[in-house]
Design a protein with these regions (language model features):
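Conserved, function-defining micro-sites of small-solute handling proteins
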Residues: 1-126
C-alpha cells in the first residue's frame, strides 16, 4: 500500500478529483476543507499528534525594524482580505500571521520540537 504525507493545499485537488483518499489530517483539528476526514489523533493510536506545515516571510538579519514591521503590517493586511482569505481556505490553507518576535519564538519552538523527534527516531544523515 502506498502512503504519503503532503500538505493539504497541494493534495486537495487530487483528493477532490478522487485520485487520492485522505485517511487523516495531521493538524490538531479537522480541516474545514475536508470536514469528514479525521485528525490522526482521532483516527489512530497517536494521541495529541499535531504536525502542520507553515510558511513565513523572513528578512535578512540586520534589516531595520521599521522595514520588518512594515512587511508584517502589509502581510497582515493582505491576509485579512476577505478575497485572499477565502481563496486560501478553499485550498485547504489556514491564513494566519504573527508579530515578528512571536514568529521568531514560534520558529525556535518548532526547531526544538522537530530536533527532539529526529533525535528520538535515531535518524542519521548519510
Amino acid at each position: 500500500m502506498d502512503v504519503m504525507f503532503d500538505n493539504l493545499p497541494s493534495a486537495l485537488p487530487q483528493i477532490k478529483a478522487g485520485k487520492l483518499i485522505a485517511l487523516a489530517v495531521t493538524s490538531s483539528e479537522r480541516s474545514a476543507a475536508l470536514p469528514d476526514v479525521p485528525t490522526i489523533a482521532e483516527a489512530g493510536p497517536v494521541k495529541g499528534f499535531d504536525a502542520t506545515s507553515w510558511f513565513g516571510l523572513l528578512a535578512p538579519a540586520g534589516t531595520p525594524a521599521e522595514i520588518v514591521n512594515r512587511l508584517q503590517q502589509e502581510s497582515a493586511k493582505a491576509l485579512g482580505s476577505p478575497a485572499l482569505k477565502e481563496r486560501l481556505l478553499s485550498q485547504g490553507a489556514l491564513p494566519g500571521g504573527m508579530a515578528p518576535a512571536d514568529f521568531g519564538r514560534f520558529i525556535a519552538a518548532e526547531t526544538r520540537k522537530w530536533a527532539a523527534v529526529v533525535k528520538a527516531s535515531g535518524a542519521k544523515v548519510d
